[in-house]
């Protein structure tokens, strides 16, 4: 396709990892890759793909992850209303904490939250646990 057209070609579909990104670029020769559902399961995939090209490594701290999660939730609330935003974030918020110690404990709490305030409280508790304050939630 790329050789047949004079416009940039953008690859798309089933890109869920950095490896998928490079496979798409190498196998198709496309000029760019569009990431869609892959970032739902890994909200940091865009930066990981950029890092793989530039040779840099951006580590998202716990605070970065929590701030981005709250920004996402607030943005959804601004556009869709809090009720819809929280319903969507029940399935998305845990991805921001994936791979961090104790994240599974909080996944269940996130699935039951009803307000942005609930999400903020859950994330605050998560940070306390990560920082070693194990005195709440029965730890």
Q: Where would I find each of the regions flagged by the language model?
A:
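Alpha/beta catalytic cores of nucleotide-metabolism and tRNA/nucleoside-modifying enzymes
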Residues: 2-11, 15-139
């Amino acid at each position: 396709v790329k050789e047949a057209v004079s416009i940039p070609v953008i690859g798309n579909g089933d890109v869920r990892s950095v490896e998928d990104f490079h496979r798409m670029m190498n196998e198709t020769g496309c000029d760019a890759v569009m990431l869609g559902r892959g970032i739902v399961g890994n909200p940091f995939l865009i930066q990981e793909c950029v890092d793989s090209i530039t040779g840099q490594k951006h580590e998202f701290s716990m605070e970065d992850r929590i701030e981005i999660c709250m920004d996402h939730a607030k943005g959804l609330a601004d556009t869709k209303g809090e009720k819809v935003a929280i319903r969507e974030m029940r399935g998305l918020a845990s991805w921001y904490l994936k791979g961090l110690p104790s994240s599974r404990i909080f996944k269940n709490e996130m699935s039951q939250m009803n307000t942005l305030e609930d999400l903020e409280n859950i994330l605050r508790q998560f940070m306390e646990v990560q920082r070693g304050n194990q005195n709440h939630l029965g730890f």
